[in-house]
Amino acid sequence: VAPDAAKVESLLEQAKSLADSLSFAFDTPSGVPNPTLFLNPEPRQSDETQNGIAGMGTLVLEWTRLSDLTGDDKYAQLVQKAESYLINPTGSPEAFPGLVGEGVSLETGEFLDSRGGWGGGTDSFYEYLIKMYLYDSVAFEEYKERWVLAADSTIEHLASHPNSRGDITFLLQFDGSELHPTSGHCKLLLCSMRHISS
């Protein structure tokens, strides 16, 4: 597709059309996007009162890139306003430096809990912090700082080793300062992302 300018332009037009169709998700009091939208019979938001950090955090790269490709800053402005609540959290305190909760209020942009970790529903937020820095290291230096803070806290507070296998590391979940010994495939992301950021 890339060598064919007409096809690239057609894909870009479709991406703009899709983003324009979904952009009303950000029409909330805080600018945090509503995670559930209905397009038929007419566009409307769900009754959701919060969004999760992964749902919010994964939009930032694609919508910022769309603004860069189209020269229309409106897409980047929408997602970066929402992302600002994740970068500079308020509400429920961080359980550990850089490690935020899961739910963010659509009304205020404040965190509603201090529960999280590197599982489904949370890990993508952290993943996109370092991806944004790699995308533009000048504009998104703060994202890298946030990533390093979260990674360092993860190593210090969430890393766990079985008594019988000190060479194996598991990452714990947290609810405030209380740690929970659960693990899953998403935890592998930290290892790969830590390698990328070093």
PLM regions with names:
Residues 1-198:
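Glycan-recognition and catalytic cores of secretory/periplasmic carbohydrate-active enzymes
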